[in-house]
Curated annotation (Swiss-Prot):
Pfam families found in the cross-reference section: SmpB (PF01668)
Name of this protein: SsrA-binding protein
Organism: Chlorobium phaeobacteroides (strain DSM 266 / SMG 266 / 2430)
GO BP terms: trans-translation
Function: Required for rescue of stalled ribosomes mediated by trans-translation. Binds to transfer-messenger RNA (tmRNA), required for stable association of tmRNA with ribosomes. tmRNA and SmpB together mimic tRNA shape, replacing the anticodon stem-loop with SmpB. tmRNA is encoded by the ssrA gene; the 2 termini fold to resemble tRNA(Ala) and it encodes a 'tag peptide', a short internal open reading frame. During trans-translation Ala-aminoacylated tmRNA acts like a tRNA, entering the A-site of stalled ribosomes, displacing the stalled mRNA.
GO CC terms in record: cytosol
HAMAP family associated with the record: SmpB (MF_00023)
Keywords: Cytoplasm, RNA-binding
Family: Belongs to the SmpB family.
Gene Ontology molecular function: RNA binding
UniProt-listed CDD domains: SmpB
Entry's transmembrane regions: none
Localization per Swiss-Prot or TrEMBL: Cytoplasm
Cited InterPro entries: SmpB, SsrA-bd_prot, SsrA-bd_prot_CS
Length: 157
């Protein structure tokens, strides 16, 4: 008889909150990421950050730069750099499509969130994005404040 598998508890998705504020998101896609075992364990504990990270295409491969993964505390074999470059796993066709859009329109690749899918594999949601100007950021803040005030008025009545 087979044993019942215990449901694994994973950390909630790790979000890059600043990305939606600083960029206009045009298109999103999900990519796999190449990690070492100790890095996966560290991400499961929630010791990762996407702040100030970005993706770039180099020699036909997509690389994630500046993603911080704190080294796993029980790993004694090797010490890894916390902000090393990590390869994103996409099809050649998807990479080619991204590369043409980045080159012709001046867009950037920004990671939005890191999450574990239902099979327990770490995935990164990346987006083609265009940087916002300062007045766009101010407009976003104003619209958020107006929305918040509306919600407060709805609660009182």
């Amino acid at each position: 008889m087979s044993k019942k598998q215990q449901p694994q508890t994973f950390v909630q998705a790790i979000h890059n909150r600043k990305a939606r504020f600083e960029f206009h998101i045009l298109e999103t896609m999900v990519a796999g990421i190449e990690l070492l075992g100790s890095e996966v364990k560290s991400v499961r504990q929630g010791k990762a950050s996407l702040n100030e990270s970005y993706a770039m295409i180099h020699h036909g491969e997509v690389w994630l730069e500046n993603m911080q993964i704190t080294p796993y505390e029980h790993n004694h074999l090797d010490t890894l750099e916390a902000k090393r470059s990590r390869k994103l796993l996409l099809n050649r066709e998807e990479i080619r499509k991204l590369e043409t859009k980045i080159n012709e329109k001046g867009l950037t690749l920004v990671p939005l969130k890191a999450f574990f899918n239902n099979r327990g594999i770490l995935k990164i949601e990346i987006a083609l994005a265009k940087g916002k100007k300062l007045y766009d950021k101010r407009e976003t803040i104003k619209s958020r404040d107006a929305e918040r005030q509306l919600q407060q008025l709805k609660k009182t009545y």
